[in-house]
């Protein structure tokens, strides 16, 4: 008799995705972040669901309802801080996951990569709308500044912004719709994750060497299930340390002041995970140019398969490309730092140089150095 997990229509899907899935024998801990992202999404949906039971999406009571969750709801404080810091963990895992894809050439799986970019945009949109919900000063002004960027679109810009706001400024209608979308999007993300995995399982996983490993595969369970559990425990340790010891470390103190349309905070800035894109936006003195650069800073990832000029897939055996990759990482950290600084000398020029370097590395220098490496190897 066939094992039920291999014959039952429902169990068969789970079996083929998580148990009997053939996986390369050489994948390192950099391949852990996919499962960690799944765990992050689960944590966010669960904590978000319980927070939504106590939250009110009304400008008069939103801030108060978050205070009520922290003070009066049983374990409300831990739900709120798990959700807020869970978003930070989500983005740390996302950036490492994308970085892994860039380093090891995973972007040659075109469908998986493109769905991944869609997921990145969806998660960023969800996080932005979630930041607006507590209705603190930074929530209100962040929403005002970022939605206002759409007014740079020719002809339809102003109408589009007013349509998103549901009025002539960020107000009650805006908060209500942001809550609705913030609740809905994670489920769309979960569906996109299924599509992401569907495309991945069509090709099988990449590995650090970038060489096809079809002749050397091992079952996902128990080898990689136990490895994923270890990764999950490490992430849980970091997340719980953040939540229990310094829950406000990554937040902005301005968000503990209720939203006031009549008083602008001295420095309007988004959460830390958007600072690199915010720095690129601010580095261009033109509004439309800034918006385009902001979108392209993420969308440029879609060009990676076209910009791959090397004869090798992975950077594992390409030291020159490795140098440029780590320069790109350092550049992104510089942009993140600049995004949190005021717009004054010397931060303006540093931001502009870092933005130029970011696009130059991806669009020009990395493809060129790959061609040089091909010649050095006489390929």
Curated annotation (Swiss-Prot):
Where along the chain is a ubiquinone bound?
201
* UniProt xrefs under InterPro entries: Cyt_b/b6_C (IPR005798), Cyt_b/b6_C_sf (IPR036150), Cyt_b/b6_N (IPR005797), Cytb/b6-like_sf (IPR027387), Cytochrome_b (IPR030689), Cytochrome_b_C_euk/bac (IPR048260), Cytochrome_b_N_euk/bac (IPR048259), Di-haem_cyt_TM (IPR016174)
Record's cofactor remark: Binds 2 heme b groups non-covalently.
Return the Pfam families for the record: Cytochrom_B_C, Cytochrome_B
Q: Give TM segment ranges.
A: 33-53, 77-98, 113-133, 178-198, 226-246, 288-308, 320-340, 347-367
What is the membrane topology noted in the UniProt record heading this document?
Multi-pass membrane protein
Q: Which residues of this UniProt protein bind heme b b562?
A: 83, 182
Function, as annotated: Component of the ubiquinol-cytochrome c reductase complex (complex III or cytochrome b-c1 complex) that is part of the mitochondrial respiratory chain. The b-c1 complex mediates electron transfer from ubiquinol to cytochrome c. Contributes to the generation of a proton gradient across the mitochondrial membrane that is then used for ATP synthesis.
> Other remarks?
Heme 1 (or BL or b562) is low-potential and absorbs at about 562 nm, and heme 2 (or BH or b566) is high-potential and absorbs at about 566 nm.
Give the record's subunit note.
The cytochrome bc1 complex contains 11 subunits: 3 respiratory subunits (MT-CYB, CYC1 and UQCRFS1), 2 core proteins (UQCRC1 and UQCRC2) and 6 low-molecular weight proteins (UQCRH/QCR6, UQCRB/QCR7, UQCRQ/QCR8, UQCR10/QCR9, UQCR11/QCR10 and a cleavage product of UQCRFS1). This cytochrome bc1 complex then forms a dimer.
What does the similarity note say?
Answer: Belongs to the cytochrome b family.
This chain's protein is named: Cytochrome b
